[in-house]
């Protein structure tokens, strides 16, 4: 069941890739993918290329995939291990969602952080109290870790 669904999503992604994202299996393992997300142009992550790993559980799509950043990101909803605080990867997951929709949600999270549900409270605090400092720090991390 899971592998059939994953194959279908892969075909759909190749046919109609979401803007500024790409994803596909690592080697021969259909349950382990790597994705690339381009930093959205209207965000401090612009110009960055962010690598993301995707692990599908055996009972996918009834359980959400495990998605994590491999590239370091300065963001209130992404911690230093690359974990992402995104409702659709947890309690709001639905089998109707696809990897394509997950990647687009991560892109919009980069543009619009959710400081009220932070994974990194210090960054959320900075975002709320000193947005310029947040944006310049996020930009410098992007240049340091996500470019070249």
Swiss-Prot record:
It catalyses: S-ubiquitinyl-[E1 ubiquitin-activating enzyme]-L-cysteine + [E2 ubiquitin-conjugating enzyme]-L-cysteine = [E1 ubiquitin-activating enzyme]-L-cysteine + S-ubiquitinyl-[E2 ubiquitin-conjugating enzyme]-L-cysteine. The active site is at residue 85. InterPro entries: UBQ-conjugat_E2_core, UBQ-conjugating_AS, UBQ-conjugating_enzyme/RWD. Keywords: ATP-binding, Nucleotide-binding, Transferase, Ubl conjugation pathway. Ubiquitously expressed with the highest levels in rosette leaves, roots and petals. GO terms for molecular function: ATP binding; ubiquitin conjugating enzyme activity; ubiquitin protein ligase binding; ubiquitin-protein transferase activity. Transmembrane segments: none annotated. CDD domains: UBCc_UBE2D (cd23792). Its EC number is 2.3.2.23. The keyword Transit peptide does not apply. GO terms for biological process: protein ubiquitination; ubiquitin-dependent protein catabolic process. Residues 1-147 form the UBC core domain. Pathway: Protein modification; protein ubiquitination. Accepts the ubiquitin from the E1 complex and catalyzes its covalent attachment to other proteins. Mediates the selective degradation of short-lived and abnormal proteins. Belongs to the ubiquitin-conjugating enzyme family. Interacts with CHIP and the E3 ubiquitin ligase BB. Associates with the E3 ubiquitin ligase JMJ24. This is Ubiquitin-conjugating enzyme E2 10. It comes from Arabidopsis thaliana (Mouse-ear cress).
């Amino acid at each position: 069941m899971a592998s059939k669904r994953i194959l279908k999503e892969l075909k759909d992604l190749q046919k109609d890739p979401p803007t500024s994202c790409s994803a596909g299996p690592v080697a021969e393992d259909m349950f382990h993918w790597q994705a690339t997300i381009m930093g959205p142009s209207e965000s401090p992550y612009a110009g960055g290329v962010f690598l993301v790993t995707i692990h599908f559980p055996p009972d996918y799509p009834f359980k959400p995939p495990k998605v994590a950043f491999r590239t370091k990101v300065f963001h209130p909803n992404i911690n230093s291990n690359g974990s992402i605080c995104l409702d659709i990867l947890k309690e709001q997951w639905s089998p109707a969602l696809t990897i394509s929709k997950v990647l687009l949600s991560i892109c919009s999270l980069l543009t619009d952080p959710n400081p009220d549900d932070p994974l990194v409270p210090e960054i959320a605090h900075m975002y709320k109290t000193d947005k310029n400092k947040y944006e310049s720090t996020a930009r410098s991390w992007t240049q340091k870790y996500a470019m070249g």
